[in-house]
């Protein structure tokens, strides 16, 4: 009959099932550690004696901590003496000082969190007090009988809330960056639809008479009021947008837009690319204020990198990473095309020329044909030879 053994514990089993069960016991794991340390294995009886001795020590330590004052670093023989000590004036004064010391540490943590963009207004006061009490109990002491502080799940959650300075965020909530990009996509689709509607109305003007126009105006008296309300809604800045007189990268406020741009250039090394062709400075800074304040988006990272959930956090990121600049490489420059006018860089541009005149050039001017030679003549008066 086959014999099943454990070389580490030096025991034998009558079947494989008992052997597999033995491999899962604490006794076998204990002997494995002793084997790694080049020590002889212990028997099952010896292991049980060690376990009982360890439990007795743990119980003794737990009794010691039950009558030990962590604030005053004193041990008491009985619970009555311990209870009387908790009511003494000296203990109350020391506990108050300990609370003040821990409170200062919490305030310092909150100041650091503010620098990182995490607020403290939403912290529950009860949660903060509970975390302070837990921190007082966890303070190190000189007593050899004091057992180490083991925080519970509740204390970890409370202390984490105090350190972060913000409540736990819903994991299903969309990041502000994604919400902002979706809003921009909707605005672009609406703008394209309105432009197509305007083009269709212009094409239909030749087929409509004055009477029909008057009839439409009478049938829809509230259209103009609705358009006015939509215009007012578009003019009002969205919630959280940074004003054009506030810095995009810190809390500095300027008295004018020009001074604000000068501050960002001097303090944060911010510069506007191709500024000689910039036609709408106010619109550009307003757009960037919405991008940073509403979308919580880094001007350099854009859709790449980590998501931010507060304006202070994305501002701290841009300052720390030197991202106080616009990303305009490749197709990314098209994002700011509405704020620029590059017509002055065209070789055939004439100062004061209406851009509509350039777009409305007739096809006869673009392509002409010589009646005698049947050659195409380009707008620059150059002949085309096949």
From Swiss-Prot:
Lineage, top ranks: Eukaryota, Metazoa, Chordata, Craniata, Vertebrata
Gene3D superfamilies reported for this sequence: Classic Zinc Finger
Family, per entry: Belongs to the REI1 family.
Pfam family, one: zf-C2H2_2
Keywords associated with the record: Acetylation, Cytoplasm, Metal-binding, Nucleus, Phosphoprotein, Repeat, Ribosome biogenesis, Ubl conjugation, Zinc, Zinc-finger
Subunit composition and interactions: Homo- and heterodimer. Associates with pre-60S ribosomal particles. Interacts with MELK and MYBL2. Interacts with DNAJC21.
Main location: cytoplasm
Region listing for Disordered, in residue ranges: 135-237
Phosphoserine sites (modified residues): 269
Metal-binding in keyword set: yes
Coiled coil: none
GO biological process: intrinsic apoptotic signaling pathway in response to oxidative stress; positive regulation of apoptotic process; positive regulation of JNK cascade; positive regulation of MAPK cascade; ribosomal large subunit biogenesis
Zinc finger (U1-type): 4-28, 67-91
Keyword Nucleus assigned: yes
Function: Pre-60S-associated cytoplasmic factor involved in the cytoplasmic maturation of the 60S subunit.
One GO CC annotation: preribosome, large subunit precursor
Molecular function (Gene Ontology), one example: zinc ion binding
Annotated protein name in UniProt: Cytoplasmic 60S subunit biogenesis factor ZNF622
UniProt PTM: Phosphorylated by MELK. The phosphorylation may redirect the protein to the nucleus. Ubiquitinated by HECTD1, leading to its degradation.
